[in-house]
Curated annotation (Swiss-Prot):
Underlying gene: smc5
Domain notes: The flexible hinge domain, which separates the large intramolecular coiled coil regions, allows the heterotypic interaction with the corresponding domain of SMC6, forming a V-shaped heterodimer.
Single GO biological process annotation from the record: positive regulation of maintenance of mitotic sister chromatid cohesion
Region (Disordered): 1-27
Keyword Nucleus part of the UniProt annotation: yes
Localization per Swiss-Prot or TrEMBL: Nucleus; Chromosome; Chromosome, Telomere
Protein name: Structural maintenance of chromosomes protein 5
Upper taxonomic lineage: Eukaryota, Metazoa, Chordata, Craniata, Vertebrata
Assembly and binders: Forms a heterodimer with smc6. Component of the SMC5-SMC6 complex which consists at least of smc5, smc6, nsmce2, nsmce1 and nsmce4a.
Polar residues composition bias: residue spans: 12-22
Function: Core component of the SMC5-SMC6 complex, a complex involved in repair of DNA double-strand breaks by homologous recombination. The complex may promote sister chromatid homologous recombination by recruiting the SMC1-SMC3 cohesin complex to double-strand breaks. The complex is required for telomere maintenance via recombination and mediates sumoylation of shelterin complex (telosome) components. Required for sister chromatid cohesion during prometaphase and mitotic progression; the function seems to be independent of SMC6.
Signal sequence, renumbered to the chain: none
Annotated residues for binding of ATP: 71-78
Family: Belongs to the SMC family. SMC5 subfamily.
Region (Flexible hinge): 450-635
Length: 1092
């Protein structure tokens, strides 16, 4: 179905354009395309787009050389770039826009298509891609036939087209990424773009060869180490084999000793049995003789025992009588002691009476003296004047002081309460400030974790603020404080992280000082921003928020956060935060109406961000929406106004606290004055009161003392009478003591008589007892010897039986160990046996001792057996397997050595192959880089700048780390610096990128190159120079097709006949393509030029 005529847009090229033939390709390799009528295989003849991005339908016919695609922003220039990429099976990631191919279909359409016709010798190639929005899938056709994407990719690859290579295809969104490419990535992209087809393959082979070489080197090293360890291990095993045979020799000796041991034990038992029999016969004879010698001694002991019995009875009787007499003596002695104690108590009582009477007389004397003194003092007091009026005056002044103190105490209590309240308020305010400062530290830690260079620069700034004349602000994410943590995600999604971590300067000279220190000297990758000279922080939004509330918008982005004036001014200028409304879920449901009715460029719904671009001509709107990611930094919010207010309140509170403290000290001084005056008045009152009551007190004291004196005089004791009574009591007790003493003397005499009689009896009994003791001692010695002899005879009999049985058992065990029958005797062969242990690596056998020459005593055999066992136990962990293991390891070492030799030979062969492959790759590569460097250097020299391109590698053998290094210098007072995303400005990076691509242009191995809006950010001088270089390079005969997309052109530029200028316009009032007369248009332009 034909497209509506008014929407068709066709770009055609004048057929009279001239082209040059392409000559031979550099380095002598065959080109992918062949030159036919000025075109290379793979160059683009036609691009047709239907319902694609901003286009309903359009056809583009580019020329064979330089194609300048010019048009205002939003007209659809980049749409042509997108069509080339997607139409040639490129990935959406290459474009850096939407990640789904369905997003490239025009809004409101269900499908769109791209058709690209490529020149190919023998028949052009037409590739068609139809994109379906519903399932986000594409249908492919080649020359009208249905094919899959893989087939299209193969066709494109065969034509040397690489839309993913930034050296060939550089879309607008990827311009900045060119400078971010590593040296290695740039080298690979250059190889693919302008190198021979086999160059990149050789490079990949070299990297693979090098990787395999490393693997072989590691294998050889590991095998060498393994063989060395195996040899060491086998050497240890050889030692274990020696130890195994040594252990076996000891075990054989143990076996031989264990065979002889029972025979030696049997012989020892037999000899001991003969000795026991002889000893038993001798013991029996001695026992019989001892029994005959004991009989007379027993009879003599019996006679003495009969004589001792009467003496024993008499001594017991005397002992009882002596005990009775002693008891009586003790009783009388106790009675005498009690009487003596009674006399002492009577005398003590009399002495106490005397002391009491003496004290009584002293008290009477003292009382009389006190009465006289009191009468004298009373006479003096009666002469003093009346003190009552003065006491009344003192009481009045004390009451006035008490009233004043109550007033001061009330004021002090009120001030103390106010002081406590002020202290509590200060603590609360200080805590809030500390909490805010802690939140700022958390944000700073997050910054350090994300970008350490920025954090290092922040520390330097804080230490060197005195070096700057104007305001210098820390990174924006530390200066921005969102008013509600829920708003943080909108601010972060709108402002790039590169700006959030940027330092903001009020003065440009301060920024230059800062960047010179941290970027050039400290080599830190930081961003800095100069605030606008005219503040825009208070710029008004284009529409009142009240007019937008019906769509769900509730505020503008600027109102969601606070920031210093310079920071806010920059954000308003750069990000238009004062014109970015934020809406709710209602906004999302009304998004189509919002897009159509409101003239907005950026807006937020509850969880999405929309970017709108309105075409200048057609007024059509293209939108890009993306999800709002959660906040990472700004959700930690600190209200700067609240913080400032808290600091002011804290200062006011501390001032009030100090004022209250000073007033309290003044009141304390007043209280001290009152206290001193009260003490003086109370002392005076006390003195006057004492003086007033002293007369009455003296009279009372005199009366009391006189009463006490009369009572003491009436209670006088008669000591003479008491003394007579004491003497009579002592005399009566002494009479009782005389009677007791007489009885005590009689008892003592009786006890002495009985004791003498007992002594005489004991002496006679001791004589008989001594004689009996001697006889009993002699008898006990004989009886003990008799019992000992009897026990010895019994023990010998038992030992004889035990040894007999033991000998039989030992004989049976010895024959069993030697494998003999019960009736056999020890053979001569066993007596003289020899044992040989022959290790496989020894030449001479080592005989063991003969059986007959082994020790002949059990102790010697046990000693030797223990020694052999101890020695054999020293050889732990050994078995027959150690010999097998030794032999097996020896064989394995020989096999490994053979394998190692094979690996070394293979490694040497691999190194030879690498050397040959290196020559095939490195020499052409150096020539290619040298050619690029010549062009690049010449281009920069023509711009009065300096630049060079070289092949860079850290180590010659690390082929995966080879890279192309671009170094440039734009100012005469600086040195060459490597092209990075950080050191050069955006315009400088664009110039460098463009000139590098121009350096590749004449080496043209690719059919075409595309560069989209790379001149953005260039200053006019550099832009004019770059344009001249592009025209001069891309319009030569031997060059590939070139697409240069730009929204603007400077005046009075130089053009070439080989150029094709494609002007892109759109709008509601565009002239339909079928009514466009390009010849008439050119004629009118020439006429206007002639008139001018």
């Amino acid at each position: 179905m034909a497209e509506p005529e008014k929407k068709r847009r066709i770009s055609r090229v004048n057929s009279s354009q001239t082209s040059s033939n392409i000559g031979k390709i550099l380095s002598g390799h065959r080109p992918c395309g062949a030159e036919v009528e000025g075109r290379m295989d793979g160059s683009i003849l036609r691009i047709t787009m239907r319902n694609f991005l901003t286009y309903d339908y359009t056809e583009v016919y580019p020329g064979p050389n330089l194609n300048m695609i010019v048009g205002a922003n939003g007209t659809g220039k980049s749409s042509i770039v997108c069509a080339i990429c997607l139409g040639l099976a490129g990935k959406t990631a290459v474009l850096g826009r939407g990640d789904k191919v369905g997003l490239y279909v025009k809004r409101g359409c269900q499908k769109g298509s791209i058709e690209i016709e490529l020149y190919k010798h023998g028949g052009n190639l037409v590739i068609t891609r139809e994109i379906h929005v519903e399932n986000n899938q594409s249908h492919w056709m080649i020359n009208g036939k249905q094919r899959n994407q893989k087939a299209v990719e193969e066709e494109v690859k065969n034509l040397c087209i690489q839309v993913s290579n930034l050296c060939q295809f550089l879309p607008q969104e990827k311009v900045g990424e060119f400078a971010k490419m590593s040296k290695t990535e740039l080298l690979e992209a250059t190889e693919k773009s302008v190198g021979p087809p086999e160059m990149f393959e050789f490079h990949c082979e070299l990297k693979n060869f090098r990787s395999k070489e490393r693997e072989l080197e590691n294998t050889v090293t590991e095998k060498t180490k393994y063989i060395e360890k195996a040899k060491q291990r086998n050497e240890r095993n050889k030692h274990d084999v020696n130890r195994y045979y040594e252990k076996k020799r000891h075990l054989d000796m143990i076996e031989l000793l264990e065979k002889k041991k029972p025979w030696v034990e049997y012989e020892s038992t037999r000899k001991e049995l003969e000795s026991v029999k002889r000893e038993r016969e001798e013991a029996k004879r001695n026992l019989s003789a001892l029994r005959h010698s004991q009989a007379p001694m027993i009879r003599k002991i019996k006679e003495i025992e009969d004589r001792l019995q009467p003496f024993d009875d008499q001594i017991k009787s005397q002992t009882a009588a002596i005990k009775d007499a002693a008891l009586k003596c003790k009783q009388k002695q106790d009675q005498l002691d009690r009487k003596q104690k009674e006399i002492e108590d009577i005398n003590q009582a009399f002495k106490l009476k005397e002391m009491e009477e003496d004290d009584h007389q002293k008290r009477i004397s003292n009382t009389r003296r006190i009465i006289e003194d009191l009468r004298t003092e009373l006479a003096k007091v009666e002469d003093q004047p009346d003190v009552t009026p003065r006491i009344n005056d003192v009481n009045s002044e004390l009451r006035r002081n008490q009233i004043e103190r109550a007033r001061i105490d009330g004021e002090k209590c009120e001030l103390c309460r106010e002081k406590d309240n002020a202290f509590a308020q200060c603590r609360s305010l200080q805590k809030k400030l500390n909490d805010m400062n802690n939140l700022m530290k958390v944000k700073e830690e997050k910054l350090r974790g994300r970008h350490r260079d920025t954090h290092a620069a922040l520390q330097w700034l804080r230490q060197n603020r005195n070096r700057f004349r104007g305001n210098v602000y820390e990174p924006m994410l530390l200066e921005i404080n969102v008013k509600d943590h829920r708003f943080a995600k909108y601010v972060e999604n709108h402002i790039s992280f590169q700006d959030l971590r940027a330092f903001v300067f009020q003065r440009k000279e301060d920024m230059e000082i800062f960047m010179s220190e941290v970027r050039d000297k400290m080599n830190l990758k930081v961003n800095s921003i100069s605030a606008p000279e005219q503040s825009r922080s208070k710029a008004q939004p284009s529409q009142n928020i009240e007019d937008l509330r019906r769509f769900g918008f509730f505020t503008y982005l600027r109102e969601m956060f606070d920031a210093p004036d310079e920071v806010m001014s920059y954000l308003c200028q750069q990000y238009n935060v004062h014109n970015v409304p934020v809406g709710t879920e209602q906004t999302k449901t009304m998004i189509r109406q919002v897009i159509e009715e409101l003239n907005l460029r950026v807006l937020f719904t509850l969880d999405e961000r929309y970017m709108l671009k309105r075409s200048v001509y057609s007024k059509m709107i293209s939108t890009i929406n993306s999800p709002v990611n959660p906040s990472q930094y700004l959700s930690i919010a600190v209200d700067a106004e609240e913080k400032r207010q808290l600091e002011q309140e804290l200062n006011a509170c501390e001032l009030r606290f100090r004022e209250i403290d000073e007033r309290l000290k003044a009141l304390q001084r007043e209280t001290a004055v009152l206290d001193r005056r009260d003490n003086e008045l109370l002392a005076e009152k006390k003195k006057l009161s004492e003086l007033k009551g002293k007369k009455r007190q003296l009279e009372q004291k005199i009366s009391t003392k006189q009463d006490s004196l009369r009572q003491m005089e009436q209670n006088v004791t008669d000591l003479k009478k008491i003394e007579e009574e004491t003497k009579e009591k002592v005399s009566a007790v002494n009479s009782q003591k005389v009677t007791i003493v007489k009885a005590f003397i009689a008892s003592i005499k009786l006890k002495a008589t009985l004791t003498m009689e007992k002594v005489y009896l004991s002496l006679e009994m001791m004589g008989l007892s001594a004689e009996k003791t001697k006889l009993e001692h002699d008898f006990r010695e004989g009886a003990s010897l008799l019992r000992s002899m009897d026990q010895r005879c019994s023990q010998l009999e038992q030992r004889k039986v035990q040894l007999t049985e033991q000998g039989k058992g030992q004989m049976k065990r010895a024959k069993s160990i030697c494998n003999m029958q019960p009736n056999d005797s020890l053979s001569e062969e066993l007596r003289n046996v020899r044992v040989y242990v022959i290790p496989p690596y020894l030449c001479v056998p080592s005989p063991l001792m003969a059986f007959a020459k082994l020790p002949d005593t059990p102790d010697d055999i046990d000693s030797m057996l223990n020694e052999e066992r101890s020695r054999s136990e020293c050889f732990t962990g050994l078995s027959e397997n150690v010999v097998d293991e030794y032999n097996r390891s020896d064989q394995e070492i020989k096999e490994l050595e053979n394998e190692l030799e094979e690996k070394k030979n293979a490694l040497e062969s691999y190194r030879q192959n690498i050397s040959e492959a290196k020559e095939r790759w490195l020499n052409p590569l150096k020539q290619l880089v040298e050619q690029i460097n010549e062009k690049f250097t010449a281009f920069f020299r023509s711009m009065n700048c300096a630049g060079e391109v070289d092949l860079h590698s850290e180590k010659e053998e690390d082929y995966d780390k080879y890279g192309i290094r671009i170094r440039v210098k734009f100012h005469s007072n600086t040195q060459l610096h490597e092209l990075t995303p950080f050191h050069q400005s955006g315009g400088e990076r664009s110039v460098s990128t463009m000139l590098y691509l121009m350096s590749l242009q004449e080496l043209n191995r690719c059919p075409f190159r595309v560069v989209d809006e790379i001149n953005q950010g260039m200053d006019p001088i550099n832009e004019r120079r770059v344009f001249d270089i592009v025209v001069g390079t891309a319009c030569k005969e031997r060059t590939s097709q070139y697409f240069f997309i730009t929204p603007k052109l400077l005046q009075n530029l130089k053009y070439a006949e080989e150029m094709t200028v494609l002007c892109v316009h759109n709008g509601a009032y565009m002239l339909p393509p079928n009514q466009w007369d390009d010849k008439a248009f050119l004629r009118r332009c020439l006429q206007r030029k002639a008139k001018a």
